[in-house]
């Protein structure tokens, strides 16, 4: 029976795993130290080479002579001390004070008395410090990463193609949106212009029709505009022949008014005037009724006529238009005749009768529906369907707790049920 190499069980054996690990770690440490030493030696060599180049440049005169690296720490009153003089036995404090008194007249960066001399840049060291600070700045690192990513995207043709496609799609969407907005504006403008043209044509048509009717109606007698008085056509023609001012028109109207008052004392003439007035009003009513039946929108036509009349006052001072405007003012309401009142009353009565018949029909229909429902309920109670209704009532009134308590006997019946999953039925 061989137990293998027993030396491997010894702690000092070089082939054990622990000893191999120790040797490897020592070698790694030695290698790291060697690398550090080599790096330091390389830096020293570079620094010496720079110093030699700097010294050679100073000797040649290409560069100004530079002070030692640590001399800036001793600048000021203490930096001007000459150690050789101190060795010769001169008191240093007195010398320092003398130097300070001499330099009080003109401050400079050499004495350290110049404001801001502490924060002044000190050559290459300050530049190196600044560069290291910039490199270690987190914002600078973030910007550097962003620039690298941008450079990667720009160098990647696939991504650039996708970006171009996206930009093109966005531009096309914007152009389509602009075109749609332009089309909508154009349609709105067209609709407005067509509606305004239509309304103006309707106004002109209605104004021409009213003027024709005014010219055809009452050839013998006519009303003076504004006073509701009737004069002969000869007087009216005289008024139309010469353009009258507003005061002359008022005077003419007042004369006609007084003439009509004086003539109203004679009864036969007054009766004839009344009959002609009633006949003219009947003709006008019949014409207005026919116009209502023909036109589908009387309110709009009336409003357009009123607007036309208002604008007509400024456009042309013709007496025909003034008569039309005074007769049909916005607050004008004409009196209905007895025949029209009777006809409207009959229409209202017929409408009320029809409404009453409709109400009775609805009531009868509801009564029939209720009778049919009662009949169906009776049939259900005979056929044994009342149990279904009772079940529905009990289900609506019972709760989940009642149902669980009713079925509690079936939840666990034997000891075997304890071993089964309670979720499975």
From Swiss-Prot:
Keywords: Coiled coil, Isopeptide bond, mRNA processing, mRNA splicing, Nucleus, Phosphoprotein, Spliceosome, Ubl conjugation. One of its GO terms (biological process) is mRNA splicing, via spliceosome. GO terms for cellular component: nuclear speck; nucleoplasm; nucleus; U2-type catalytic step 1 spliceosome; U2-type spliceosomal complex. Its main location: nucleus. Residues 146-343 are annotated as: Disordered. There is a cross-link at residue 391 (Glycyl lysine isopeptide (Lys-Gly) (interchain with G-Cter in SUMO2)). This is Pre-mRNA-splicing factor CWC25 homolog. The gene is CWC25.
């Amino acid at each position: 029976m061989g137990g293998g190499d027993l030396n491997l069980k010894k702690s000092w054996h070089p082939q054990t795993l622990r000893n191999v690990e120790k040797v490897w770690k020592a070698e790694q440490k030695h290698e790291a130290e060697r690398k550090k030493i080599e790096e330091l030696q390389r830096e020293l060599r570079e620094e010496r080479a720079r110093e030699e180049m700097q010294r050679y440049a100073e000797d040649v005169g290409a560069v100004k002579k530079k002070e030692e690296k640590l001399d800036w720490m001793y600048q000021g009153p203490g930096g001007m001390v000459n150690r050789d003089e101190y060795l010769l036995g001169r008191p240093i404090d007195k010398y320092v004070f003398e130097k300070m008194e001499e330099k009080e007249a003109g401050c400079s960066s050499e004495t350290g008395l110049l404001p801001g001399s502490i924060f002044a840049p000190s050559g290459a060291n300050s530049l190196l410090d600044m560069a290291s600070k910039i490199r270690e700045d987190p914002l600078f690192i973030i910007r550097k990463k962003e620039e690298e990513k941008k450079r990667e995207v720009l160098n990647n043709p696939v991504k650039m193609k996708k970006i171009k496609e996206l930009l093109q799609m966005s531009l096309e969407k914007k152009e389509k949106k602009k075109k749609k907005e332009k089309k909508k504006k154009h349609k709105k403008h067209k609709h407005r212009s067509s509606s305004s043209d239509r309304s103006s044509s309707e106004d002109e048509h209605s104004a021409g029709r009213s003027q024709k009717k005014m010219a055809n109606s009452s050839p013998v007698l006519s009303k003076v505009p504004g006073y509701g008085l009737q004069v002969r056509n000869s007087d009216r023609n005289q008024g139309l022949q010469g353009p009258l001012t507003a005061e002359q028109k008022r005077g003419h109207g007042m004369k006609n008014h007084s003439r009509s008052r004086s003539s109203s004392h004679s009864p036969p003439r007054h009766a004839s005037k009344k009959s002609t007035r009633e006949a003219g009003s009947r003709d006008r009513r019949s014409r207005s009724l026919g116009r209502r039946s023909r036109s589908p929108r009387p309110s709009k036509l009336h409003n357009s006529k009123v607007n036309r009349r208002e604008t007509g006052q400024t456009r042309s001072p013709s007496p025909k238009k003034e008569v039309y405007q005074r007769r049909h003012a916005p607050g004008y309401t004409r009196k209905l005749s007895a025949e029209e009142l009777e006809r409207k009353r009959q229409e209202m009565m017929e409408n009320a009768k029809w409404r009453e018949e409709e109400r009775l029909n609805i009531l009868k229909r509801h009564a029939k529906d209720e009778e049919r429902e009662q009949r169906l309920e009776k049939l259900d109670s005979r056929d044994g369907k009342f149990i279904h209704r009772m079940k529905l009532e009990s289900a609506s009134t019972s709760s989940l707790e009642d149902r669980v308590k009713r079925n509690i006997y079936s939840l666990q019946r034997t000891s075997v049920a304890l071993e089964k999953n309670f979720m499975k039925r």
